[in-house]
Amino acid sequence: MGIENLVQNDVVLTRLDALFNWGRKNSLWPMIFGTACCAIEFMSAVSSKHDLSRFGAEVMRFSPRQADLMIIAGTISFKQAPILKEIYDQMCEPKWVVSMGACACSGGFYDNYTTLQGIDQIIPVDVYISGCPPRPEAIIDAILAIQDKISNESIKDRHKDYKGLLDA
């Protein structure tokens, strides 16, 4: 007996969406991929003054298999790009990405042949944080934007390969 026999209309799915999204948005497990000064600025966002853990992003993960939010902070070179892509592929689904700082968003002032001009060329980015380096308040705003995005997601949209099973 599969879910297609249990679900006859979208009422159950909307309730499940609300439940899953509430749990996911309030228990983000971030992993920082820090390569430059933005990673140092991220430390102030998790300090006691700003306390990022108030927003559900308390437990920092250092393994991509345990993280669902990747925060890329700093310059990414073309040599690092395959490594970043591999780490992104190792993350569990659903996963979200925050591009933190001018270097991660657009290459910053490193406009040369070795620097990737924005990480969105290799992985999808959900939220961009501008600044060089961005303030801790901007990092908190990005976490709130990710939580807002999670609140509006649906199980049907998240698992496109199982769409036939979820539609009655």
From Swiss-Prot:
It catalyses: a quinone + NADH + 5 H(+)(in) = a quinol + NAD(+) + 4 H(+)(out). It is a peripheral membrane protein. GO terms for biological process: aerobic respiration; electron transport coupled proton transport. Pfam families: Oxidored_q6. Its cofactor is [4Fe-4S] cluster. GO terms for cellular component: plasma membrane; respiratory chain complex I. The keyword Metal-binding applies. Keywords: 4Fe-4S, Cell inner membrane, Cell membrane, Iron, Iron-sulfur, Membrane, Metal-binding, NAD, Quinone, Translocase, Transport, Ubiquinone. It comes from the Bacteria. Its EC number is 7.1.1.-. SUPFAM superfamilies: HydA/Nqo6-like. Belongs to the complex I 20 kDa subunit family. This is NADH-quinone oxidoreductase subunit B.
